Amino acid sequence: MPSERRSPDELDCDYMNQLHNDLRVLRAVVDEELRRRWDRSLPFADALFDRWERADQLGFGEGSSVYDSAHVFGSVAVGEETWIGPFVILDGSGAALTIGNYCDVSAGVHIFTHDTALRCVSMGQAAARRSPVSIGDGTYVG
């Protein structure tokens, strides 16, 4: 039987402190292994979770990967062997966003299928513009 959900005020401080300590130890172990094997240090979630598994869960093409820190919204399709870097935003909430095969979307890139600049500068008189975005095969974005 699942435990009853408690408010943050009701959480056991000893339990939370132990959990925090356990996570710190895990973070140190993961970071040490990354540095040893690949000479890199990543944000905890990016280091902890598998990029290829996440891409598969999102329905991206075979062999593609997406960092845990990347944000994916709306209708986004990604082809095979495509790399989506850390801190990327793929926002297909305005229309479809399609990225081809063998592409690299570099760290921090933001791709949107909508534009709200006219809505803002017109003080709401103009609507946001929405349009599909398609990035072809073999493209580097960065």
Language-model-detected regions and their locations in the chain:
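Terminal amphipathic alpha-helical/low-complexity segments used for targeting or macromolecular assembly
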Residues: M1-Q57, G61-G63, Y102, T116-L118, ...
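Flexible, glycine/small-residue-enriched loop-and-beta-strand segment within the central core
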Residues: S41-D50, L58, A70-V78, W83-G142
